Each structure stands twice: as structure tokens, then as C-alpha cells.
């Protein structure tokens, strides 16, 4: 759709529209650019097509070279990685902003986690001048009324700090868990009542796991000193994550 490339987290914080960077070193996508993210589940060659839905009816006519590929894309399964967006100054300190993209198609032969197709959330990394050695890592879950910029450079000693976000594109938050497969995460107002059936998927917690695994691989982190911190609603996020992924 017309806002699929919109970085909802950064736009909400800045109060103006910001768009995703999908390849490090490139600029953000242009306004109105369509974006769809799919994670390869099996090695192979893939063709993709784009269809449109008008007044509830999908136009499925395929025109090679126009709305469908003529040459397949060779894809290989690998662990999804966050995409660097930008650096910013918070006071006199530098933070880095990344985006985690999660495909709703998580397993071959299984239904989508959500009809939205993909879920994207940002997180902030404050390196605290750590370049080598082994440092503690703090994952900070913000409370209600705040966002992922809250206390992003507040650290103790030589620890690194990561502040994740969990808002859904429609404006609701995922309560650091996720959502039901039938919940419309793109348009909160369309959810007149809570879903009474379907599977509840923990894609927000999956994002936290990906962040931690990425940090262990790419940052000077002491794996014996990874801490979760939360205030108010963020306490729920830290507590629930520790219970599910001890």
C-alpha cells in the first residue's frame, strides 16, 4: 500500500513522515513507494508478482515484465539481519537506529502470522564508546507514554544499551508480545472488537531475540552480562520475555 515504506516508529517520534532504508548506504525510500518484505524459507529461484485490490476485488492478471518478474531471483536461507537506518546525536552522544523486518510467512506450509505480510520495528543502539573487549548489554523496554528514544543513552559503567520499539503501524502497541493473526495491525480503528479465535503470535518477542543474537555476533558483548530493564508497561515486556526465553 501507499504507506508500506513508512517508518512508523521514527515518524511517530519525529512528528513527520520518515521512510525506511532497505539497504545500508542508500537513502530512504521515496514517499508512495510500495514495500513488501518476505523471508526466504527454502533455497531456490523465485518469481514475484504484484497485484492490486480495488473495492475489495483483487486484480490477478499477470503481465510479464510489468507486474511480474520474467527472470527469477536466486535466494538462499540465512538469518535475517537488522538494517541500519541512520545515526543521530542525543545531546553530546551518538546513537544508531536500526530496523528489524519480520516476514509474516514464518514456515513452509503454515499460515501467515498476520495478514499485514510483514512487521517492522526500530531499535536504538548506544555503543557507549565500546569498541573491543567484553561489555554488559542492557535491553531497555520503555513504558507506556514513552518510545524507544526514552533514556536511550542512560547507561551504567561500560555497558552498551539497546532500546527496542513495539508499536504497530496502526498506532496500537504490541505490549511487547505481538498480536492475533486476525488483528489488523495496519488500521487499529478497523478492529471493532478483539479477535475471538486464531493464533496469538509473539513477533515482538521474536524481534527481541533477533536483536540479542545480532548484538552477540556483531558487538563486543559479554554474554554472561545481558540484562533486561523495563518501567511500567516495559516491566511487563522484560518479565514476559525472561519467562518465555530464560
Model regions and ranges:
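Short beta-strand element of the alpha/beta-hydrolase
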Residues: 127, 133-144, 153, 161-162
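Recognizes extended acidic, P/S/T-rich segments that occur
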Residues: 1-44, 56, 227
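Alpha/beta-hydrolase active-site loop
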Residues: 189-220
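N-terminal cap/lid segment of alpha/beta-hydrolase-fold proteins
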Residues: 75-133
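Conserved alpha/beta-hydrolase
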Residues: 159-172
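Hydrophobic beta-strand segments within extracellular beta-sandwich modules
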Residues: 48-49
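Primarily recognizes the serine-hydrolase "nucleophile elbow" in alpha/beta-hydrolase
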Residues: 223-246
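Extracellular fibronectin type III
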Residues: 53-84
